[in-house]
Amino acid sequence: MGAQQGKDRGAHSGGGGSGAPVSCIGLSSSPVASVSPHCISSSSGVSSAPLGGGSTLRGSRIKSSSSGVASGSGSGGGGGGSGSGLSQRSGGHKDARCNPTVGLNIFTEHNEALLQSRPLPHIPAGSTAASLLADAAELQQHQQDSGGLGLQGSSLGGGHSSTTSVFESAHRWTSKENLLAPGPEEDDPQLFVALYDFQAGGENQLSLKKGEQVRILSYNKSGEWCEAHSDSGNVGWVPSNYVTPLNSLEKHSWYHGPISRNAAEYLLSSGINGSFLVRESESSPGQRSISLRYEGRVYHYRISEDPDGKVFVTQEAKFNTLAELVHHHSVPHEGHGLITPLLYPAPKQNKPTVFPLSPEPDEWEICRTDIMMKHKLGGGQYGEVYEAVWKRYGNTVAVKTLKEDTMALKDFLEEAAIMKEMKHPNLVQLIGVCTREPPFYIITEFMSHGNLLDFLRSAGRETLDAVALLYMATQIASGMSYLESRNYIHRDLAARNCLVGDNKLVKVADFGLARLMRDDTYTAHAGAKFPIKWTAPEGLAYNKFSTKSDVWAFGVLLWEIATYGMSPYPAIDLTDVYHKLDKGYRMERPPGCPPEVYDLMRQCWQWDATDRPTFKSIHHALEHMFQESSITEAVEKQLNANATSASSSAPSTSGVATGGGATTTTAASGCASSSSATASLSLTPQMVKKGLPGGQALTPNAHHNDPHQQQASTPMSETGSTSTKLSTFSSQGKGNVQMRRTTNKQGKQAPAPPKRTSLLSSSRDSTYREEDPANARCNFIDDLSTNGLARDINSLTQRYDSETDPAADPDTDATGDSLEQSLSQVIAAPVTNKMQHSLHSGGGGGGIGPRSSQQHSSFKRPTGTPVMGNRGLETRQSKRSQLHSQAPGPGPPSTQPHHGNNGVVTSAHPITVGALDVMNVKQVVNRYGTLPKGARIGAYLDSLEDSSEAAPALPATAPSLPPANGHATPPAARLNPKASPIPPQQMIRSNSSGGVTMQNNAAASLNKLQRHRTTTEGTMMTFSSFRAGGSSSSPKRSASGVASGVQPALANLEFPPPPLDLPPPPEEFEGGPPPPPPAPESAVQAIQQHLHAQLPNNGNISNGNGTNNNDSSHNDVSNIAPSVEEASSRFGVSLRKREPSTDSCSSLGSPPEDLKEKLITEIKAAGKDTAPASHLANGSGIAVVDPVSLLVTELAESMNLPKPPPQQQQKLTNGNSTGSGFKAQLKKVEPKKMSAPMPKAEPANTIIDFKAHLRRVDKEKEPATPAPAPATVAVANNANCNTTGTLNRKEDGSKKFSQAMQKTEIKIDVTNSNVEADAGAAGEGDLGKRRSTGSINSLKKLWEQQPPAPDYATSTILQQQPSVVNGGGTPNAQLSPKYGMKSGAINTVGTLPAKLGNKQPPAAPPPPPPNCTTSNSSTTSISTSSRDCTSRQQASSTIKTSHSTQLFTDDEEQSHTEGLGSGGQGSADMTQSLYEQKPQIQQKPAVPHKPTKLTIYATPIAKLTEPASSASSTQISRESILELVGLLEGSLKHPVNAIAGSQWLQLSDKLNILHNSCVIFAENGAMPPHSKFQFRELVTRVEAQSQHLRSAGSKNVQDNERLVAEVGQSLRQISNALNR
């Protein structure tokens, strides 16, 4: 759209330039017009070219108008560069469709306004204004060339006025406004011009129109009001800030005064091609610049002044005034010197709010600056379409920029009001509008696969079988039936106006626009885009439209679908269509089209409208067209057939989607399907979308029921969309970002959320690598004799990706990423990855779980109409699905264990036994360090596989992930790395970091949903939905356990499945310890899930590992924390955004908040004592927890190091046996249990760890009691994260409390826990963690240093706790560095992330955990950087690590803390916890930092950390910073064009870590004051650059090369400064 708009605008501006340099509307400005060579309008004939340059559409539309129109439009456009962009098009249109007279009239109206207020500050009023200008310009241009700009403008304006209301013209910007001849009065000091519309509120007030000129005679005492006399003779008071002197620059909509370059870039980030502003330099007053956006980047042009006072940008064109210069450059022409014409003035930020533009602010009105435009997706009749990010929620949305002349703003607003009420799963949901100033935006949900026409043409018969086509047609009929029931006429139904999401979900789009178009626009005129071949005969003959004419169009659409996107009436000229139809001709039956379908087409093509069927009957016919089976069933069959060949999951998905609830159930095939089905029922279309990939979800269920089905699903993934998904999933890391966009129809780019990835900087790289590994692994899994599992996983992966992708990007991202990574990382990588999906979805039954979760996603999707909302819903559903999944899991225990667990690993005995250590490690890694992208991790995993030591560490990391996933079970799995096969799966599950994914989704989705539709689920989809979705307490856990089906299997899985009767997840206050939500939508949810897992783990939570349960709860918490952090890092935006709204709080509701407060208070009270406990509860802090235990154990085994977590693990083991006892156990979750020694090899260590965790609190006194204390802390955190969870836990008593804490923890405890974990990680995993954040290189280093890890481990052992805390700090490290980091850091950080969730872990997520404690935001970043550095250092010297840890801890703990990195207090706390042996636990309670939860995202890590430990701050040593600098410099050596979006985020995170480390260093370092000042300047620059890097993925290569060069320069300067 931007380009198109640019063209149009260019044309407009060109027109304006030629015709109306003076008059923005084409009114006045003949001089300018003539001056501007590119004034398209200037020369009627020439104008075409300018127009062409600026407006292809306009040119075509205006063809009839011919040069005149073109020029008119051009001039209008030029005139209203910004405002007229739209109008210009209409000008073209109008000219084409309207006679010049109309244009003139419209223009005249506009002109009058212009003349009245010569300098229209914001002329961009309506799209029409631009068109007016265009038309007027056209006429004017000829005149204007002579110089009769004003006259022409007026005449044109007159013509155009009819079309364009003054209101519109007022909103339209045209450069001509700037050119309006000043006239004699310009110098009159009393003449003012209105900047905004003002609606008089009283008798004595005077209403103003923007651009209107008034004479100001006096002011009131306060100066807030002034007495204005209008030209019409009216007198009244107007607000003084609504008017500005006529001769001031402020009157111009494009003049922003003294704002900084950065502020200008920020303002323009929400613009499109041609958005611009003129600003004055802050540093050198009087020096002005033009800031212009083009193709995603902002260009700054200095405005020079020559000795004669003339201003110019290029020597060739000099002007007397700034307005003339702007006008000249707003008209497209050769050699104007700017990269693109100036089209849309950026909205001013300081608009007075006292008098809003409209009496009541529209809830649908979105602040333009909340929208960050990314790239153009295409252009259409109404304008261009962009992919954008809604920054408030981090959601990917589609933005349509409306061409101003296409429709009247008033009509558009009325229509938008109707669109806002249209909510149906098969209608694209309106999210909001930007109508304050042009360009006008319509913001809708994002559909990843674009329009149906292109989809049909690109897919072909191999991918889309008849069932899929019928399914899509049915969805369209469903959406149109809804419109019909609302008496709504679409008027432009065609394949090009339907959008495709994942799983073949189809939605009707543009249903609100056709009617909005001016009547004349929809009158066939030469060159107009009138859909003749889709229009019913009565529409062609009499321009009559009705729902029956939409039915005719549907018949043509059916034909398009049947022919895979052929153009209708082939070989028939447009002009002959009507005559042929009149003679009875109808298109023949397409080859391969079933007669029933063709009969339906022919019914739609009845000449008499009354003979045509209704959409309701059409929908019914399509649903029941074949063999008395519903279309859903038919589709399902077809898909299943395909599935066998292509991907069974796909068919089931389609079945689900199509069937609506019923079909879904069928597709679900089994318990999962039934629950899912219900959900999908309501959300049929959406579900379908997800469902198709959901087919895979179905497949998992099928797997439960039928291994063959499982296999079938695999094939599906292999072929067709599923296969794509599969591949995508495997390559998810790469495409994750896009996946999020829903671009991956097949789930290709599943949502590797760049943000989330950013947390683990190397995760992206990992992802890339992982892709191959993932594929290899998939094969491997099959090889592992886990064919079913592999397939399951594949389908799951695909399905999950696709599911999350559209509706729950975050979910998908997290899941996809972690899964992807998991796959790569885990030896049974393919299974693992897929397992992760499955784990993500159904804790126990990997395959099943994931699928069900995906079903949920699709499920959710339908619930949330808006895309954003959908995501939230999806997330919700995903959780539900998982729950369902759990239930179904039991049915096919054996199969489920296979896929359910990483079951592949388990199933594959060879893997189970032989690669147990590696698998466990991988699992842990997957779990703990859910690197967003599987690729990197995969690569690292491969490396890890080589070294069992590394492998063991990995498992530890994996555990943290499960919490993210909200799979208590996974945590158990990671706790039980012993059960090699299962642990990997579980790890995978964790790794899925469904929690993270969901989290982001939930956060973003929920918020969005809340905003657009109030959905209980929407508010906290994860919580209630999750709970509702699966009655089993812990859907994920359940899923795991269920998937296992048999408790023993669960044990194999590494975590006994929670009893199905487990109380609902903590999400519900009353529910027993609910299982962690399968994929908590928000970090909080993830945390909660983990907490639940932990609690249940403590009391044999649903983890499915009795033993694991205890530890698991802790681990889960940790995991969750990492998840949260991961989520935030992956979806940095989402988490942060959520932070403000407290993820769980919003989800849980106010009661949880109270609980939260209580918890916080309790935590504070228990602060030091309980901090460790809370850490434990978090499970992150408590390495003791299963994951840690697992990690430690595995690490110990691998590295022959003593592991502290055996105790917990043992417990977990017990838990395994007591899967059914979960509930009770949950309740039992007593600190004792937690502290109960895990009989495992290193029970003492575990205990110590536990104590250490407690200690972290400041008291190592409660080894047994800690569980409750942690619970409390966790609850407090939970309160932050999940109030509901907290309440629930409270009710459940210590068990619940503990659970809540776990969840909460994550935010609070996460801080401490994270710190602890970090310490542990620092000890052993720190290396990995830090590295993890660092970069691929750091990851490599980490890996390479993994062997040193043992040394670290020693240090860790000395902080065995830390090791445990890390959940296997070493494992974390061993994980891919990213993963490792995530594991440890994430564990640590993971917990922190809960808190951190708010913060933006992306920058340096792993470190944040330590940070978290100190100060969520700053510490985290520092922590990460420190960690990064330390980890690298650590390899070389454990002591160093200790020092790093020290950074975070008090002086006593400083040596250890240093390892932590830069987290101040949090770090210290963590470290202390880590060094459980160290009696001098930091005095700083981890809990206190909980409040920082929100701060987590805060950048000022340094400050936060400072308080935590200034002494330790100094710990951030010169060497560690230099090492980090070296790492970063290595990362920057890659060619810019080879760096993916996720890698940019990782770079940004690493840079942020460096920034935090430097801040701390500067604070505490021995530097002379002047050096310190310069150093801080440098560091501030680095911080800004890290922010720029975050958006580098959407920028062009030149920008990024420049940015990378700047970063490299900054890094060199930092190293120079440090070396001085």
From Swiss-Prot:
Motif Kinase activation loop: positions: 510-534
Name of encoding gene: Abl
Entry-linked CDD domains: PTKc_Abl, SH2_ABL, SH3_Abl
Start and end residues of each stretch annotated as Disordered: 1-97, 139-168, 642-672, 687-774, 798-819, 836-906, 951-998, 1012-1154, 1199-1222, 1362-1470
Residues annotated with Phosphotyrosine modification: 522, 1497
Keyword match Secreted: no
Ranges annotated as biased composition (Gly residues): 71-84, 147-160
Record's keyword annotation contains Cytoplasm: yes
GO molecular function: ATP binding; non-membrane spanning protein tyrosine kinase activity; protein tyrosine kinase activity
Extent of Basic and acidic residues compositional bias: 1-11
Species classification: Eukaryota, Metazoa, Ecdysozoa, Arthropoda, Hexapoda
Acidic residues compositional bias, start-end: 803-814
Positions that bind ATP: 377-385, 400, 445-451
Pfam families (alphabetical): F_actin_bind (PF08919), PK_Tyr_Ser-Thr (PF07714), SH2 (PF00017), SH3_1 (PF00018)
Name the UniProt record assigns to this protein: Tyrosine-protein kinase Abl
Enzyme class: transferase
GO terms, biological process: axis elongation; axon guidance; axon midline choice point recognition; axonogenesis; branchiomotor neuron axon guidance; central nervous system development; chemical synaptic transmission; compound eye development
